[in-house]
Amino acid sequence: MAQVPMINILEAALRHGYAVGAFNVHTHEAAAVIRIHEQLRAPAIIQLIQPSAGFMGGRADFMNATPEEMCCGISRFCRLVQPMMEQASVPVALNLDHGNDPETAKICVDNGFSAVMIDG
């Protein structure tokens, strides 16, 4: 099953009265999130927090990553998790959690995120 918009997962949960977990991952943890949700036959939300994008972009001081490092990190993260999501047997959404700025949110959307949250 391919990636789905997060709103689809949330609307179904609201309609049918269940909760959906959203898990902040950095790399291969995404595979574990998907695998357990497949066992439960439940939709999953995978999230990337903005500082992790800086770290994935090669910045040791990830809280001060440049826009270029953020873009690189988001792109790397997507190349890692999107194949996992495409092979999943359950709906999976990809969300930016605790975003700090519209520029990073746009980079995420351009790289295939189905939702972003700017609250940082």
Residue ranges of model-derived segments:
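Glycine-rich tight-turn/loop motif centered on a GG-T
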Residues: 18-19, 54-74, 113-120
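Catalytic cores of alpha/beta
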Residues: 30-33, 100-112
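N-terminal low-complexity or amphipathic/hydrophobic leaders
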Residues: 25-60
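Active-site-adjacent beta->alpha loops and helix N-cap segments on the catalytic face
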Residues: 3, 74, 100-104, 120
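N-terminal amphipathic alpha-helix/helix-capping segment at the start of soluble metabolic enzymes
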Residues: 1-21, 32, 78, 82
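Hydrophobic faces of well-ordered beta-strands that scaffold small-molecule active sites
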Residues: 20-25, 44-48, 92-98, 116-118
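Glycine-enriched alpha-helix->loop->beta-strand junction motifs that scaffold or abut catalytic
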Residues: 40-41, 110-115
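Alpha-helix-loop-beta-strand connector modules within alpha/beta enzyme cores
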Residues: 64-90
